[in-house]
């Protein structure tokens, strides 16, 4: 009797002519996707490639999709611009990026009650709201308006927001794995947004970068 042995599937990087055209950024050790090229800054076992997503990517104009779940908030805002630029330059025309990141509106609505100053829960609430900003390696939390403007300023087109797991693009549906909290006053616990590469040039928005420097980064770097 002949025994059939299943050969392991060969995985080619996006640089290869037959390579995978879907890249997941910041996947960590547990969110590995079979049909995606899984990347992280750290060389975890079973990921496809360790890479700094804020540095130039080696796959210009090749990718169908880029996906990053709860990754953007771990970057300083200037690093986030670098990441979005490099992802956009790596997408082919019509390719899409999908991001999920905590909603700063939801954090403010759910973490502090604005009761009288002597309210007994204020100690815990104050700790919790700071935890949302600084815990788990967080560097920056986004409002819907800022996230939309940032994507558009970098050069993405057709910027849209979606509910958890939903998309107009079949290949981008059902990707989210992080738990989602209840919406409060219309604000979800995380913003899930997509943008497409189109005719608008992808690049670093000088005016927005100057705003970030003036209103935030200069003060963060100044220390006391």
Regions from the PLM with identified roles:
Residues 4-8, 17-19, 37, 67-68, ...:
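A generic short-segment signal for beta-strand/edge and adjacent turn/coil regions
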Residues 14, 40, 183-184:
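Short secondary-structure boundary/capping segments
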Residues 1-19, 213-224:
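Membrane-proximal basic amphipathic "stem/tether" segments
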Residues 20-107, 193-197:
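Conserved SAM-binding loop
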Residues 2, 42-46, 51-55, 126, ...:
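Proteins with a high burden of low-complexity, intrinsically disordered sequence enriched in S/T/G/P/A and R
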Residues 79-82, 86-224:
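S-adenosyl-L-methionine-dependent methyltransferase catalytic module, highlighting the catalytic core
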Residues 1-2, 8-12, 26-30, 58, ...:
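A broad, low-specificity signal for short, low-complexity segments enriched in glycine/proline
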């Amino acid at each position: 009797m002949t025994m059939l042995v299943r050969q392991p599937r060969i995985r080619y990087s996006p640089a290869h002519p037959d390579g995978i055209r879907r890249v997941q950024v910041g996947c960590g050790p547990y969110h590995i996707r079979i049909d995606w090229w899984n990347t992280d800054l750290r060389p975890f076992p079973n990921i496809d490639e360790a890479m700094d997503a804020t540095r130039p990517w080696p796959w210009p104009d090749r990718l169908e999709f880029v996906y990053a779940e709860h990754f953007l908030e771990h970057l300083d805002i200037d690093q986030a611009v670098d990441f979005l630029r490099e992802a956009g330059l790596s997408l082919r025309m019509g390719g899409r990026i999908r991001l999920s990141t905590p909603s700063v509106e939801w954090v403010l609505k759910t973490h502090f009650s604005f009761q009288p100053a002597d309210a007994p829960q204020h100690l815990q609430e104050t700790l919790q709201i700071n935890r949302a900003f600084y815990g788990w390696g967080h560097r920056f939390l986004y409002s819907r308006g800022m996230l939309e403007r940032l994507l558009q300023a970098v050069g993405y087109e057709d910027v849209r927001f979606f509910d958890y797991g939903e998309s107009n693009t079949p290949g981008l549906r059902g990707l989210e794995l992080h738990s989602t909290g209840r919406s409060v006053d219309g604000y979800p616990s995380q913003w899930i947004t997509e943008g497409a590469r189109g005719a608008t040039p992808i690049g670093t928005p000088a005016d927005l970068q100057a705003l970030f420097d003036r209103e935030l980064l200069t003060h963060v770097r100044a220390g006391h």
